[in-house]
Amino acid sequence: MQPSTATAAPKEKTSSEKKDNYIIKGVFWDPACVIA
């Protein structure tokens, strides 16, 4: 399950940079959510 990624995907679908930030911060937030 990836609630954070799933919600961020449609919102930042046009912002690839934001997605990278989510991945980097995801490691600090929830590695399982980002990796999943």
Curated annotation (Swiss-Prot):
Q: Where does it sit, as one GO cellular component term?
A: plasma membrane
Cysteine methyl ester modification sites? C33
Lipid anchor (S-farnesyl cysteine) at which residues?
C33
Please classify the protein's predominant subcellular localization into one broad category. membrane
Which Gene Ontology BP annotations are present? pheromone-dependent signal transduction involved in conjugation with cellular fusion
Q: Which UniProt keywords apply?
A: Cell membrane, Lipoprotein, Membrane, Methylation, Pheromone, Prenylation
* Gene Ontology terms for molecular function: mating pheromone activity
Where, subcellularly, is it found? Answer: Cell membrane
General function of this protein:
The active factor is excreted into the culture medium by haploid cells of the A mating type and acts on cells of the opposite mating type (type alpha). It mediates the conjugation process between the two types by inhibiting the initiation of DNA synthesis in type alpha cells and synchronizing them with type A.
Membrane protein topology class: Lipid-anchor
Native species? Saccharomyces cerevisiae (strain ATCC 204508 / S288c)
Please tell me what else the database record remarks about this protein. Present with 28900 molecules/cell in log phase SD medium.
Asked whether the UniProt record includes Electron transport among its keywords, one would answer no
Enumerate the propeptide ranges. Answer: 1-21, 34-36
InterPro entries tied to this protein? Mfa1/2
What S-S linkages are listed for this chain? none
According to UniProt, the name of this protein is: Mating hormone A-factor 1
UniProt entry tagged with the keyword Transcription regulation: no
Q: Name one Pfam family in it.
A: MFA1_2
**Gene that this sequence comes from:** MFA1
